[in-house]
């Protein structure tokens, strides 16, 4: 019960929490009002970096959401050329994470990480179409248990300025394992083949729990 109300935070959040706490103490010495603002900032930092446990279905017939957020795209596209799959057709689901969403990302399926590719870029609003091509991003090319290519792309946004990768090439992952996070508002794209989408535009998702697609 305690962990549900006060979930643990991601290690990336520790230094920000310390900084926010220090600022709060300084502001308290100046005035109670400013101290209250600092306290609210500290609470928000804790909330942003929260890393709650999730109930994972553990079923290879499904893909689960890699991110908390809102579905903004469900479409058929060419695969990402950055990982050499632009000669294949994929379905793609895009999920936008606002600054109040949990930003820890998880793998949609069990399988092997065949490639990880970081691409520097710009910081347009992550909800825009061009964010998939122009923004800073990190690609995870996975092979699921049936041999299907699954690609997860972490995309930095207007406020997000750092993509954190916690996964290694050739690593074997279980569905719902943490793969990294993006700081302060961002987007996750999932490219997949041989699954049918289960979500619609405007739907809210929970990382590791919401079923995105089914074989």
PLM regions: where:
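Contiguous, well-folded functional domains in the mature portion of proteins
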Residues: 1-215
């Amino acid at each position: 019960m305690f962990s549900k109300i006060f979930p643990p935070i991601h290690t990336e959040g520790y230094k920000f929490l310390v900084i926010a706490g220090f600022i709060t103490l300084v502001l308290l010495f100046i005035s109670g009002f400013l101290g209250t603002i600092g306290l609210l900032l500290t609470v928000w930092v804790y909330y942003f970096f929260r890393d709650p446990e999730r109930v994972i279905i553990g079923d290879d017939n499904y893909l689960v959401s890699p991110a908390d957020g809102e579905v903004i795209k469900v479409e058929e596209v060419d695969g990402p050329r950055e990982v050499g799959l632009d000669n294949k057709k994929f379905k793609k689901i895009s999920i936008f994470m606002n600054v109040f969403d949990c930003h820890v990302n998880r793998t949609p399926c069990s399988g092997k990480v065949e490639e990880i590719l970081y691409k520097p870029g710009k910081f347009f609003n992550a909800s825009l179409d061009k964010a998939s091509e122009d923004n800073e991003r990190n690609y995870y090319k996975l092979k699921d248990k049936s041999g299907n290519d699954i690609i997860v792309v972490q995309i930095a946004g207007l406020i997000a300025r750092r993509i954190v990768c916690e996964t290694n090439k050739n690593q074997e992952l279980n569905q719902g394992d943490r793969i990294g996070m993006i700081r302060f508002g961002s987007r996750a794209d999932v490219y997949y083949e041989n699954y049918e989408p289960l979500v619609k535009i405007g739907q809210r998702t929970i990382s590791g729990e919401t079923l995105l697609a089914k074989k």
